[in-house]
Structure formats: C-alpha cells, structure tokens
Curated annotation (Swiss-Prot):
GO terms for cellular component: small ribosomal subunit. Belongs to the universal ribosomal protein uS5 family. PANTHER family: MITOCHONDRIAL RIBOSOMAL PROTEIN S5. Part of the 30S ribosomal subunit. Contacts proteins S4 and S8. With S4 and S12 plays an important role in translational accuracy. It comes from Pelagibacter ubique (strain HTCC1062). This is Small ribosomal subunit protein uS5. The lineage of its organism: Bacteria, Pseudomonadati, Pseudomonadota, Alphaproteobacteria, Candidatus Pelagibacterales.
C-alpha cells in the first residue's frame, strides 16, 4: 500500500518524514517509528501532525487522523497563491513565502512543497534557510501562512474599501 499520496473524501494526505526512534530501557532498546504528515483539501484547508507508534503504518494512520482533526483555513488569492509575502521562523528554520504570477508553479523544496500542494497553492516562491529539519520547516511554514491576511480582512480592520487596500499587482 502506498502511503505517499492518499486521497480520500477530498482530503489529500502527504507523508513528509518517517523517523526511527529508540527508547533505551533496562532490558535493552525499544524501537518505534514517528511520522510527520500534512493533509489538506487543496482549497485552503490544511492540517499538520506528528505521531509515534511501534510500526510505520500505525504511526502514519495516527498522524493522518490527528491532522484531520486540526485543519485550519488559509486565505488564498484567486485560489492559486498567497495574498502577500510572509516570513516564518521556528527553531533554526526560517522560511520566506512570496506570491507569484500565474504560471510560475511551486518553487519550493522538500516539506514546504508538500504543504503548498495539499493547501492548493499553484504559484509560489519559497526560500528556506537555517535548517533542513522537516519538523522545523513545516512549523515555520505554518506560522508564516497563519500570519497572512486577506485584503477583505485588512480593509475591515482599517475601515477602508477593499479597492483602497489592494494595490496594482503583476
């Protein structure tokens, strides 16, 4: 059974990282596995989870179930990119996400690409710095995406019209 991309009831599941973990006990070592998973509906909803179990399939299943419970909404511009450039940091992981014109594609590496694909982002440029640890990169990406505001939300806060908030975009 392939666990990489599993699509069920409109939710796309992507396995980002599997790690073998060891617990040292009096009688020796106990081995287990941890799984990092991102899930999303490819229309602005995303969930991230990390789970541990004795077997790989059990860890993936637990992570998928947890990620489905913690879905959050991320506003997208035209359903294909983010509204404005954002920066996120977690631990040593730093990420810069920039909106891109139509046809650019997903220019991002590793874990950040998985987040963009399950979120439904089609055009984005991402630069990750500091670490290649998938856990920190995913958390930094989620922090960056949660900082994003739609022009409608910004207009309401500033008591202005949406057209006054939106600048000429390329």
């Amino acid at each position: 059974m392939d666990f990489k991309d599993k699509k069920d009831d409109g939710i796309l599941e992507k396995l980002v990282h599997i790690n073998r973990i060891t617990k040292v006990v009096k009688g020796g070592r106990r081995f287990g596995f941890s799984a990092l998973v991102v899930v999303g509906n490819q229309a602005g909803k995303i969930g991230v989870a990390h789970a541990k179990a004795k077997q790989v399939p059990d860890a993936i299943k637990k992570a998928n179930e947890t990620a489905r419970r913690v879905l959050i909404h991320v506003p997208l511009r035209e359903g294909r990119t983010i509204h404005h450039d954002v920066y996120g940091k977690d631990g040593a992981g730093k990420i810069i996400l920039r909106s891109a014109p139509k046809g650019t594609g997903i220019i991002a590496g590793g874990p950040v690409r998985a987040v963009c694909e399950v979120l439904g982002i089609k055009d984005i440029v991402a630069k990750s710095m500091g670490t290649s640890n998938p856990h920190n990169m995913i958390r930094a990406t989620m922090k960056a995406l949660s900082k994003q505001n739609s022009p409608k939300h910004i207009a309401t806060i500033r008591n202005k019209k949406i057209s006054d908030v939106i600048e000429k975009r390329g």
